[in-house]
């Protein structure tokens, strides 16, 4: 009877301890204590603790009664060595009595599974792929800039050559114009225009006289300033360059040859009209009346060009 009462008190103490500590602590404590024996005829009651459900967690624990002694006396413990504990039976009964944990708690307490390699951070996957694209873009920009710089260099070189050619032509033109010492291109071109106009007036003045013949006096053609004042003819500016002094042929005069022999006459002489470059080509390009005039009197053109 005393053994039964001690076992009841022990179970009641385990129950209180189980309610305060939990199932895991009770199982660990019972496994460590190997001096209690529970008969196989009396099954252990199912103990429910804080892990069995959420309703018992909120209910307060009943206070212990003052007449109940939770500590085991020495006389009660003296009978424990005569009854060896079957530890496998006690542990199996306690493990069987514990309810299975809720699946939600196991899911919540379980560590998160490792992420697959496909769900790696964005930078670790995109960075290697974007590197060749960035490199290709930089190469394309570099090639485009090189092409633009090369095109600019070619354009500058062409402009430099064109300016050099223009300067050379302007120098040549300045040498052809007499008394032209202008430095600017505009003033030099003005002198060229005036010189060409004066040459045109000289040709218009002397060509009719040569076409009619040398035995007739030249027709009187007033200067542009006089013709403009008289109201006859177009208004031309006065020529800046003097007209060539050409002596007309007088048939009343008799030209006598000197009796002294000229030693230079026997030597071969150069044709004075050979200075005209492209003289025959120029005659072929002119109309027939001018070709006849220039073939008979090419000296006028020679004098006008030299002046």
UniProtKB/Swiss-Prot annotation:
Start and end residues of each stretch annotated as Disordered: 41-68, 101-155
Domain of life per record: Eukaryota
Residue ranges occupied by any bHLH domain in the UniProt entry: 150-199
GO molecular function, one term: protein dimerization activity
Family annotation (Pfam families): HLH (PF00010)
One GO CC annotation: nucleus
Keywords linked to the UniProt accession: DNA-binding, Nucleus, Transcription, Transcription regulation
Localization per record: Nucleus
Biased composition (Pro residues): 110-119
PANTHER family found in the cross-reference section: TRANSCRIPTION FACTOR BHLH119-RELATED, TRANSCRIPTION FACTOR PIF1-RELATED
Quaternary structure annotation from Swiss-Prot or TrEMBL: Homodimer.
Record-stated family: Belongs to the bHLH protein family.
Protein name: Transcription factor bHLH127
Highest classification ranks of the organism: Eukaryota, Viridiplantae, Streptophyta, Embryophyta, Tracheophyta
């Amino acid at each position: 009877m005393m053994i039964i009462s001690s076992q009841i008190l022990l179970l009641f103490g385990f129950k209180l301890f189980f309610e305060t500590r939990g199932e895991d602590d009770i199982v660990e404590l019972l496994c460590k204590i190997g001096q209690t024996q529970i008969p196989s005829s009396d099954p252990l009651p199912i103990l429910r603790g804080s892990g069995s459900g959420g309703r018992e967690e909120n209910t307060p624990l009943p206070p212990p009664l003052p007449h109940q002694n939770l500590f085991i006396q020495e006389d009660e413990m003296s009978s424990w060595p005569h009854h060896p504990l079957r530890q496998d039976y006690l542990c199996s009964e306690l493990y069987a009595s514990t309810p299975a944990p809720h699946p939600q708690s196991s899911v919540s307490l379980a560590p998160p599974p490792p992420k697959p390699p496909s769900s790696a951070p964005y930078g670790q996957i995109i960075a290697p792929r974007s590197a060749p694209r960035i490199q290709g873009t930089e190469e394309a920009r570099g090639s485009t800039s090189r092409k633009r710089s090369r095109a600019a260099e070619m354009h500058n070189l062409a402009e430099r050559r064109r300016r050099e050619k223009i300067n050379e032509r302007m120098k040549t033109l300045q040498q052809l114009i007499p008394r032209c010492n202008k430095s600017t291109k505009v003033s030099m071109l003005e002198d060229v225009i005036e010189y060409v106009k004066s040459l045109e007036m000289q040709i218009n003045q002397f060509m009719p006289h040569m076409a009619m013949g040398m035995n007739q006096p030249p027709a009187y053609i007033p200067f542009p300033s006089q013709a403009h004042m008289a109201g006859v003819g177009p208004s031309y500016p006065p020529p800046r360059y003097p007209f060539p002094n050409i002596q007309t042929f007088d048939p009343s005069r008799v030209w006598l040859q000197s009796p002294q022999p000229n030693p230079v006459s026997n030597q071969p002489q150069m044709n004075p009209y050979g200075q005209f470059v492209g003289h025959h080509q120029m005659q072929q390009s002119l109309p027939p009346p001018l070709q006849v005039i220039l073939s008979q009197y090419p000296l006028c053109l020679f004098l006008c060009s030299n002046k």
